[in-house]
Amino acid sequence: MNDDMPEQTYNVIVPEKGVPVKAWTKGVPLEDKARQQLLNVAQLPFIFRWVAAMPDVHWGIGATVGSVIPTKGAVIPAAVGVDIGCGMMAVQTDLNARELPDDLKRIRGAIEKAVPHGRTNHGGRGDVGAWREIPTRNVELWQTLKPRYDAILEKHPKLDRGNTSNHLGTLGTGNHFIEVCLDEADIVWFMLHSGSRGVGNRMGNYFIEVARKDMQRLFINLPDKDLAYFSEGTEYFDDYVEAVEWAQDFARLNRHLMMEQIVGAVRDSGELRPFVAELKAINCHHNYVARERHYNQNILVTRKGAVRARDGDMGIIPGSMGRVRTSFVARAI
């Protein structure tokens, strides 16, 4: 949320009941299904002031992709979804495009060897997307996450289904990617897109189902069953917030470790001169919940396919995976 955005930059959609939707979609088509999703969210009684929609807003599972949902006293698990903490990381190097080899095959091979990716055997034993032998560095950093994870499992043992520590520092599948890219000055960057892997998926699905059952038990009618929520002070509210914050920390660390592995692998490939990385480094979520303060109120802000844009914040807007396209590294003003 940005409390002082000039009104002329967005359209205002006023629902029959509820708060307005501020849509930064001037000159951009807004599909009917996405519009209805936004209106469904806007009529919930705990939405704080307004719902925001970004220029690339589109229909999504659970909630509209490219939306910002501020809530007071409640949280909607499906609005975050099952890839909790999904986001981007990019680092700038001191390499120039002309220093890259004509054939990037060996660099690609080094990256693919350094970062487990994909998924086989339904994520079970022998899954190519998990570590078979976890690197020492990853084991050490997993220990910083483990005490909080164990505390979550004590209350919700159904979440303990393996593939947690051996997913830290791995890419996953779907639209997650790693790439070597160039900026407008032909400087080389490394960029990746990933989240909280299997453990975040389990937590998301588990609490989404718990929230739906809560709505049934309390006879709460919703415009969309995906908008099932936990109210502050109820049994599962604190448990969900604890789990989602942990999964977001896992996701951020997951991206950080992968980037370390990528930079190390490219350096060791023998294809390039010794280079400096992390001249600039951005690591940001775009599927997450954050505790924030707006208009002198403590609230929760859920961003689905959106990043925080306070003055000076850095963010990444990726293009479509696997195409000749442009991604953007941006600074909020």
PLM-predicted stretches and their roles:
Residues 2-37, 46-51, 61-65, 69, ...:
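Domain-length cofactor-binding catalytic modules of enzymes
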Residues 58, 86, 196:
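Short, glycine/acidic-enriched loop or turn micro-motifs at the edges of active sites
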Residues 73-94:
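N-terminal cap/recognition module
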Residues 87-124, 129-133:
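Compact, glycine/acidic-enriched structural inserts
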